[in-house]
Amino acid sequence: MLPLVALVGRPNVGKSTIFNALTRTRDALVHDQPGVTRDRNYGVCRLDEQQPFIVVDTGGIAGDEEGLAGATARQARAAAGEADLVLFVVDGREGASSLDDEILAWLRKLARPTVLVINKIDGTDEETVRSEFARYGFSDVVALSAAHRQGIDELLDEVGARLPEEGAGELLDNDPARVRIAFVGRPNVGKSTLVNRLLGEERMIASEVPGTTRDSIAVDLERDGRQYRLIDTAGLRRRGKVEEAVEKFSAFKTLQAIEQCQVAVLMLDATEGVTDQDATILGAILDAGRALVVAINKWDGQSDYQRAQAEDLLSRKLGFVNWAEAVRISALHGSGMRELFQAIHRAHASATHEFSTSEVNQALEIAYETNPPPSIRGHVSKLRYVHPGGANPPTFIVHGTRLKVLPESYKRYLENFFRKRFKLVGTPVRFIFREGVNPYEGKKNPLSDRQVARKRRLMRHVKGK
């Protein structure tokens, strides 16, 4: 599992601002008023591609154990108990408070690895602020201003040095011969029914009540001589609907399952179309770069007119992922199962294919000659060579010059060209563009003795006039 980092502290110290900076999102609501965050909010930090980790933002601990404040404090304590690393966030402008002292006391009882993060140091004397918190006795202290993104890199370095390679808990199977498939979607779209159908037994609890599955459950399957690990995840609800602590943990487990799987099967309900919740889940899959198959459930119960309407809606809402195969199924009656597995195989094969440097360079050369980059304000990008940068998703690293002016339309052209040439289906394709470092940039070109003498003669001629 991915390591888990928890942000803990009293209200209004900037935990949500740090969360947004680490996850490059605005998922956490930020406001000067204390107590805006109440539940746990999970996201994935990929600022360091070598070691992504899950971040959990918690509500401020106000010291009151009654009512809403008490529930918020319990959520924060639960998050800290799950975490591989705790970031104890304090306010550098206001200084240490008695509430900070109380939080530190129970953090020490918890005995989790902890880093002190002093936020809001902009406009202050950093040394003075650090000395005020020195009495807490932390050897690991990061001072930053999350609102201005000052010190975020230092925080990442500190987190990276303290995190284990894998988080606590049971690891998902990493057997290369076993295809890991995560079934994700909104509550009650039929994920557990589908897994039960594939297994031939009622292994998962399936019910018409949304939210029956609360945890991610992994089971092994052998089908047609191939090994699979099927991961049935809890349905992801809209944030406003996720209230119970156990459902917060379910959302966390679903994110972990997406990160650890090789193929994500996004299940949609043919009777409801594509909703905002579906788009949110799809966004999590694309962020993780996982192979994708769209399974449209309850298709058998639709009339011809309803099917035509659903097809039109799918083409409009999911047109931007037209590289993913869509399979029409009935989890209840078992129709479409063979087509579903065939789509999973194609997506998995494309996502995990290993490319040679020679074949991708040949593809880049043909793409470049067929359609060279356009001139942008007199500058033309030059693509010199490319090499594979990894799999799942297939990644290609392109080296050249003036790549900053390479238009997005040309990047899409390259993606489509590589997809067509290598028959890549069901997987995102990523390109990373890198410019070579010019060793002479910013340096003056020294003149030879002959050039210096000529320059002097010219200057005398100019002055003589």
Curated annotation (Swiss-Prot):
Record-linked Pfam families = KH_dom-like, MMR_HSR1
Which Gene3D superfamilies does the record cross-reference, listed alphabetically?
A: 3.30.300.20, P-loop containing nucleotide triphosphate hydrolases
SUPFAM superfamilies cross-referenced by the UniProt entry: P-loop containing nucleoside triphosphate hydrolases (SSF52540)
Residues given in the record as GTP 1 binding sites: 9-16, 57-61, 119-122
Q: Where is the EngA-type G domain?
A: 3-167, 179-352
Q: Which UniProt keywords apply?
A: GTP-binding, Nucleotide-binding, Repeat, Ribosome biogenesis
**Disulfide-bond pairs as recorded:** none
Spell out the molecular function terms from Gene Ontology. Answer: ATP hydrolysis activity; GTP binding; ribosome binding
Outline the extent of the KH-like domain: 353-437
Concerning InterPro entries, the annotation shows: AAA+_ATPase (IPR003593), G_ENGA (IPR031166), GTP-bd (IPR006073), GTPase_Der (IPR016484), KH_dom-like (IPR032859), KH_dom-like_a/b (IPR015946), P-loop_NTPase (IPR027417), Small_GTP-bd (IPR005225)
Q: Which GO terms describe its biological process?
A: ribosome biogenesis
Residues recorded as binding GTP 2, renumbered to this chain, are: 185-192, 232-236, 297-300
The record, for SMART domains, names:
AAA (SM00382)
Q: What does this protein do?
A: GTPase that plays an essential role in the late steps of ribosome biogenesis.
Extract the HAMAP family matched here: GTPase_Der (MF_00195)
Tell me its family: Belongs to the TRAFAC class TrmE-Era-EngA-EngB-Septin-like GTPase superfamily. EngA (Der) GTPase family.
Description of how the protein assembles with itself and partners: Associates with the 50S ribosomal subunit.
Q: What is this protein called?
A: GTPase Der
